[in-house]
């Protein structure tokens, strides 16, 4: 409770109104991941997001490793003010906070998983984010089949899902399952606070049709979309996906929300952050914002 009061007091000091009319009426908005742009919880991420033409940035919670909590600057009131005011000043939103530490750490083996989720939810309060990204990549594969691991995962996700729901937020999980598997898992979890963070890369890498999969999942199960593929070429040159077809599917589903760029970097020039991400942002905006 003391920590939460500290967060609230920080918010009272620095909470600002987003610029009027900014991105008004946009059905689809485009963001990029700060950790993939080498700007994890760095103040320069907002200026960079503006420079590449993005509407927002998905902020990471910071490294986890063997730490008890994320190495998260947003627990510090001074950083709360600095990050929020800087984002406001350049007109960049933070639609989501990512717990990328769980790409390597096992969610099932963290006894303090509730504390980690609470840390994320409080950081979301600071930045005005609604979606928390929880990848299950570090949790192995045992949970994908019936058994003790799945039972425990379902229990934990229901619990943290209810934490998110009561806070007016959503935890979006990346599972690498197909649409049928995702629907089954969500049905078992039984919490409106848990949805799917759909990843185009997972679908393409596993030979699945993203358009068909999205349609099977349905609008209400998809919280947000990582709209990029495995590093090879930028999206505008990648023959592995028909992004116009993806848009038509989302239009037909009446889905709206954030498309977040994680990868799709030129494999021969992966560290050219501005070049890769500005090109991908421009391509997604051309299709999803200009192509009415």
Model-predicted segments: where are they?
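Conserved beta-strand positions in the central sheet of alpha/beta enzyme cores
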Residues: 58, 96-98, 133, 172, ...
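Glycine-rich, proline-tolerant flexible connector loops at the mouths of alpha/beta enzymes
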Residues: 60-84, 136-144
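Sec/Tat signal peptide C-region and signal peptidase I cleavage site
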Residues: 20-24
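Bacterial N-terminal signal peptides
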Residues: 9-19
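Active-site acidic/histidine proton-transfer and metal-coordination neighborhood
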Residues: 19, 46, 50, 86-90, ...
